[in-house]
Amino acid sequence: MMKYLKYYIVPLLSTSVFIGIYLGGHWMWLGLVVLFLVVVGGDAVLGEDDSQPEYSYPWLLEIPLHLALPIIILLLLSFAWASGSAGEDFLGIGQLLSGLFSYDFLTARDRNMWFDYLGALFGVGFVVAGVGTNVGHELTHRIKDRIAMLEGRWLLSASCNADFAIEHVYGHHVTIGTIEDPATARKGENVYIFYIRSTVMGHISAWKLELKRLRKKGNHLLSFNNRMITGYMMSALWCGLFFIAGGIFGLILFLGQAAIAKLILEVVNYMEHYGLSRKPEQPVGPEHSWNSTKTMSTLVLFSLTRHSAHHETPRVKFWKLDPYKDAPQMPYGYLTTLIICLIPPLWYKIINPSLNEWEQKNLPA
C-alpha cells in the first residue's frame, strides 16, 4: 500500500503553506522552509529510486493528480484573502476560521509585514509550480481526455501559462534538442538569458501552432476556439479575484507568485535539457534529457524526474516511466539542482564534465 500512499505527500506538503498564510507573521515562511527541508533533505537521506513496481489499482495514483486543482484553487483563495486590508474579510474566510479555532486570524493577518508576505509569495509560487504547473504538464499530455485537459489548463492558468499546453506538447516534444526548440538550453547559455529566450520564443511558438490549428479547422482567430485567448481569460479571472480581495496589492501578489512559478518552470526546462543537442532528423532518445533518480524528487514531481522516458514515450502515464539509469544524470535532486542553476559559474563547474563526456559519446568527431 505504501507504493500508492507515497504520492500523497504532495497534498500534505501543500498544507504547510496554507497554515503559514493563515497564522500570519513570520509563519508565512513556514511552507517554503518545510518544502526545502523535506525535498532537499529527503533526496539526501533517501537516495536513489529506480524501481518500477506493478500497480494493480492505478486509480489510486490518479487521485493525487486530481486533488491538484482543488489544492491550487484553495491556496489562491487563501492568498487572495491574505492580501486584504484591515477590516476586509474576503469571502468571510477569517470569520469562519476564527469561529472554528481559538485564534484571531484577521488580527494576525492585519499585522503582517512586507517580509512576511515575501515568504508566502515564494511558498505559493513553489506550490503553484510544483503542484500546478507540474500536474498540469502531466494532464495536458492526455490530449484525448477532455476533463484532464480542462483541469490541466486551469492549473496552468495559476501561473499565467496559457502557452504551455500548446507549445510544450506540440512544439517542444517535436523540436527537443534542436536549434528550433525554445526550451532547450544551449551549452554555455546563462540561465537568465535562457529564461527570457524560452519565455518569449515559447509564447510566439504557441501562437504559431495555435494559428495553424485554427486555420486547419476553419475557426476564426478571435473566438473561444483559440486556446491562447481562453488561456488568457482563465488567468484574467484570477487577476480579477485578487483585485477584488486586495486591490492593487492583491493583484501584485498574484502576478508575483505567477512570476516565481514561471521562473521555476523555465529553470527546470533549462536543467532538463542543458547542452544536449540533436539533429532534426535524429529520433528523440533517452540521451536527450537529463534524468534524476532521487527518491523525494521523484515522489513530489510525479516522476517528472524520469524525463528521458517521458520524452521517448510522452503519452505514458507517470507511474509507468522507465528510470533509464544509463541516461544522462543530473548531479543532484531537482530542487538542489534548480538552486545551483541560479549561480551560473557553479552550474558550469558541476555540469560541464558530464556534458563533455556526453558529447564525446554522442556527437560525431
Residue ranges, per PLM feature:
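Alpha-helical bilayer-embedded segments of polytopic membrane proteins, i.e.
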Residues: 1-46, 59-83, 95-129, 223-266, ...
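Cytosolic/stromal cytosol-facing helical appendages immediately following the last transmembrane segment
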Residues: 2-14, 144-228, 249, 254, ...
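Bulky hydrophobic/aromatic packing residues
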Residues: 25, 50-53, 78-79, 318-320
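A cytosolic-side transmembrane-helix exit/cap motif
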Residues: 47-57, 138-142, 270-281
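Intramembrane catalytic core of multi-pass membrane enzymes that act on lipidic substrates
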Residues: 53-196
